[in-house]
């Protein structure tokens, strides 16, 4: 596996294991299918315009207070990126957008919307809804319409639909059959008008007045104050997630199949995007149990859901073919869950099962879910060990046909260092996926996803994240030198790690051995004896000496803190490099202590050895002779 660039390892052939059968949830999204286009029908009359909503307010509540124009709550915008730089800014911003215009009947919601005149090199238009005053990234855009969007189940929204001839569709959205006339008795003389008209199942003519003087367009919480949602009792679903008592509250869970641990596990901290078919987009993030809820929304009629693999820690992209439109290289990995209807939205279970079709939707989603969980695991374990976590906001590229990886930390280093790597032959080095061929699309980290075993996908992710953590301790100049050393080693030997005689081999040895160490230790903490290799990941580490003869001491760091004196020979990872005994009489150092001396001054194993002796040895109970004997074993 690869580090700055990590070499492929010979591992046993992956095996597939069926997951246990789980109880049938109310709704499950998951299917392997080819890409299908989005098909739109007729344009609908828009009830959410400022003029229409103002008219609706004044007709309902004008006797209390009238407005010339209600304040804008949202803006419907079209993004028109003029360059890949502009699209990248949009993709990284976190704004929810789609590639089709809003306000139309949706005949079929697919994976892409055919836009005329957009060729292979072109960038389509995108559409979104921004809150009033929401900052816009550095992308060309146009405001198509100012909007007022109150909660759906309110008299104001109902009247707005009525005014544009959509009252029947409004009631269909509520699950009814539609009406066209005010029922009797329910006229404007009723104290409870218009609630008795719009919601006769709940309100009669008598009752408290509809108008709430504490909730007007001048209120700070307008328009959300128009409705107060009750917190109803909840039960737990098969995922262990709360199921809201109100079936109209969108909620559910997201899980991924773990092959080695033989079950479904929560997918943590991914974004759920919910669209009501008009101009309302809501988002939620899964918790540690994979649960999500959209508490401030009640759905009516058709709705649509996506899962976007992004959070504050990382954004995942990739899994595209060599002939794809270039802008898609920068898009966040997003899974379209499906269309919902029927009035029940509170128990949606999404499962990402092991893939069969390489490069397909299931492969992409299973890999993205597994990598995201591995990312959170690294953050937890690094905190427990007292080492730096990866930088926030990592840009991670996933590729379907590789088993290696690379941690360039592109967003964290000066462009001059990137240009040095490019001049050294980065794009011709085969260290990056073929489609990554320009400075703009180079990620912080690339991770190969050609695995059908969860622990191996987990392991390479731990390895690359260990590099990103190490980067925070050494800085950009050190990392630039590591990149040049790796490229030189590859050009001289055809191996990214080279061997002991390549220029700056010591830097490669330090960085790759540390990443390999955490790869094994952190994967073992997650999987223990449930793994796809002949023995567990910790034992595999204990039996490993170097990567190649006298180069990259993979097992060294573990021998500095374990309490085992392995009586068997440890072998170099590359077959034919040799084996030998390890004089391991050293114990007690911690990952946090070792990490503290892996800074910009530690550029080879000899310096590392000296710093263990000078900085860590006093008070440890170990001796200089034993430390020297251990290092000499490698």
Give the ranges of each region predicted by the language model.
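Bacterial Sec-dependent N-terminal signal peptides
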Residues: 3-27, 206-210, 216-220, 229-246
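Active-site scaffold of zinc-dependent metalloenzymes
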Residues: 410-458, 462-475
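Short Pro-Gly-centered beta-turn/loop motif in secreted/extracellular proteins
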Residues: 293-304
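Short, acidic Ser/Thr/Gly-rich low-complexity loop/linker segments typical of extracellular
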Residues: 276-295
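Zn2+-dependent metallopeptidase catalytic core
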Residues: 295, 351, 355-420
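Short, ordered, surface-exposed loop/turn motifs in non-cytosolic proteins
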Residues: 37, 41, 45-55, 59-61, ...
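A short, Gly/Thr-enriched small/hydrophobic beta-strand-prone motif that recurs across taxa
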Residues: 12-15, 240-261, 356, 370-383
């Amino acid at each position: 596996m690869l580090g700055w660039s990590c070499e492929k390892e010979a591992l046993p052939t992956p095996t597939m294991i069926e997951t246990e059968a789980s109880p049938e949830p109310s709704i499950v999204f998951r299917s392997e299918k080819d890409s299908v286009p989005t098909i739109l029908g007729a344009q609908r009359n828009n009830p959410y315009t400022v003029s229409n909503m103002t008219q609706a307010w004044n007709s309902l509540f004008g006797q209390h207070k009238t407005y010339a124009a209600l304040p804008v709550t949202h803006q419907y915008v079209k993004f028109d990126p003029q360059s890949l730089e502009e699209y990248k800014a949009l993709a990284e911003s976190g704004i929810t957008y789609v590639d089709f215009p809003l306000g139309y009947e949706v005949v079929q919601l697919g994976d892409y919307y055919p836009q005329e005149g957009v060729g292979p090199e072109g960038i389509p238009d995108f559409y979104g809804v921004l809150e009033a005053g929401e900052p816009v990234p550095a992308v060309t855009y146009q405001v198509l319409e100012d909007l007022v969007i109150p909660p759906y189940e309110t008299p104001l929204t109902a009247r707005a639909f009525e005014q544009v001839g959509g009252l029947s569709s409004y009631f269909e959205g509520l699950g009814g059959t539609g009406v066209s006339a005010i029922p009797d008795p329910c006229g404007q003389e009723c104290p409870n008008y218009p609630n008795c008209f719009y919601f006769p199942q709940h309100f009669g003519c008598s009752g408290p007045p509809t108008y709430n003087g504490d909730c007007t367009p001048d209120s700070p919480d307008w328009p959300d104050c128009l409705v107060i949602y009750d917190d109803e009792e909840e039960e737990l679903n098969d995922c262990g997630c709360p199921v809201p008592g109100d079936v109209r509250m969108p909620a559910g869970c997201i899980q991924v199949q773990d092959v080695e641990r033989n079950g479904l596990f929560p997918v943590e901290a991914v974004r759920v995007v919910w669209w009501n078919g008009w101009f309302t987009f809501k988002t939620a993030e899964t918790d540690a149990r994979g649960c999500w809820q959209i508490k401030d929304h009640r759905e009516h009629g058709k709705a649509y859901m996506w899962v976007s693999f992004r959070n504050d820690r990382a954004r995942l992209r990739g899994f595209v073919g060599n002939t794809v439109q270039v802008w898609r290289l920068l898009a966040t990995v997003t899974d379209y869950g499906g269309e919902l209807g029927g009035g029940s939205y509170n128990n949606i279970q999404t499962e990402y099962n092991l893939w069969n079709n390489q490069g397909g939707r299931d492969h992409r989603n299973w890999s993205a879910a597994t990598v995201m969980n591995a990312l959170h695991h690294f953050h937890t374990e690094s905190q427990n060990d007292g080492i730096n976590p990866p930088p926030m906001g990592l840009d991670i590229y996933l590729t379907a046909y590789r088993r290696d990886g690379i941690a360039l930390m592109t967003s964290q280093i000066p462009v001059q260092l990137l240009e040095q790597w490019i001049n050294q032959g980065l794009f011709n080095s085969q260290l990056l996926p073929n489609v990554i061929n320009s400075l703009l699309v180079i990620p912080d980290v690339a991770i190969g996803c050609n695995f059908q075993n969860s622990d191996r996908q987990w392991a390479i992710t731990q390895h690359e994240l260990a590099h990103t953590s190490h980067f925070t301790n050494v800085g950009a100049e050190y990392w630039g030198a590591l990149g040049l050393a790796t490229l030189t080693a590859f050009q001289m030997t055809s191996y990214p790690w080279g061997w002991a005689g390549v220029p700056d081999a010591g830097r490669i040895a330090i960085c790759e051995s540390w990443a390999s160490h955490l790869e094994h230790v952190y994967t073992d903490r997650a999987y223990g004896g449930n793994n796809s290799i002949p023995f567990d990941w910790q034992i595999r580490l204990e039996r490993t000496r170097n990567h190649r003869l006298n180069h990259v001491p993979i097992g060294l760091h573990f021998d500095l803190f374990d309490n085992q004196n392995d009586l068997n020979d440890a072998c170099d990872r590359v077959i034919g490099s040799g084996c030998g005994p390890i004089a391991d009489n050293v114990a007690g150092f911690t990952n946090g202590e070792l990490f503290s001396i892996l800074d910009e001054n530690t550029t080879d194993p000899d310096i590392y050895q000296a710093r263990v002796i000078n900085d860590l040895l006093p008070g440890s109970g170990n001796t200089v002779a034993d430390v020297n004997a251990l290092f000499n074993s490698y």
